[in-house]
Regions:
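Small/aliphatic-rich secondary-structure junction motif
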Residues: 1-59, 154
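Gly/Ser-rich helix-loop-strand patches that form or flank binding pockets
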Residues: 3-4, 9, 13, 106-158
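Hydrophobic alpha-helical membrane-association signature
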Residues: 18-21, 73-76, 100
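Structural beta-alpha unit
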Residues: 24, 28, 79-116, 153-158
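Redox- and metal-dependent alpha/beta enzyme cores, enriched for Fe-S-associated oxidoreductases
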Residues: 31, 42-45, 68-73, 82
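A structural micro-motif
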Residues: 35, 89-91, 144
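General small-molecule cofactor/ligand-binding pocket signal
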Residues: 38-40, 92-96, 147
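A short acidic, glycine-rich active-site loop
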Residues: 59-75
Length: 158
């Protein structure tokens, strides 16, 4: 049985699709088996692009911007964790920054996870090539099982 589950979240409704599956899976085991769920938020350090006329230049986030983003991600994870704790689940939260797939794999190692449960946006064809797939990268690089959950049809990101 899985005792430490990592659930990466991106703040979207599609990204939350794995939560209900994990809640159902874990609720059948608690309290017989102690299961710890870690909700992970990854801040990708994408640059802003400033456009002036026909010229553009990449601009890094300021420390204040990163601090604000980190706080918003932490608030979201804590709010999500609180709603799950009402079901008697043990929930932790964690925020990192960097390449999303790399950070997910690193966090799984750090917490000694038995399972990574994540949602897939269901992109295919040219959209997958253009946008890449964090889920694919995690699935093919992980040393532990990865549960991929596709969001229900019609789920809209907010």
């Amino acid at each position: 049985m899985f005792e430490r589950i990592l659930v990466p979240l991106d703040g979207s409704k599609v990204g939350e699709a794995a939560l209900s599956v994990i809640e159902q899976l874990v609720s059948r085991c608690v309290p017989v088996v102690k299961v710890e769920i870690t909700l992970l938020g990854v801040i990708t350090l994408l640059r802003h692009w400033v456009v002036v006329g026909e010229a553009s230049a990449p601009v890094s986030y300021t420390e204040d911007e990163l601090k604000l983003i980190r706080q918003r991600v932490m608030d979201y994870l804590n709010q999500t964790a609180e709603s799950m704790k009402t079901q008697g689940l043990t929930i932790k939260t964690m925020v990192t920054s960097g390449n999303a797939a790399d950070e997910i794999l690193k966090a799984a190692d750090e917490i000694n996870a038995d399972l990574i449960a994540m949602s897939t946006h269901g992109r295919s064809g040219w959209r997958r090539l253009a946008f890449g797939s964090i889920t694919d990268k995690v699935l093919h690089s992980s040393k532990i099982p990865v549960l991929m959950v596709r969001a229900p049809e019609g789920t809209v990101n907010e």
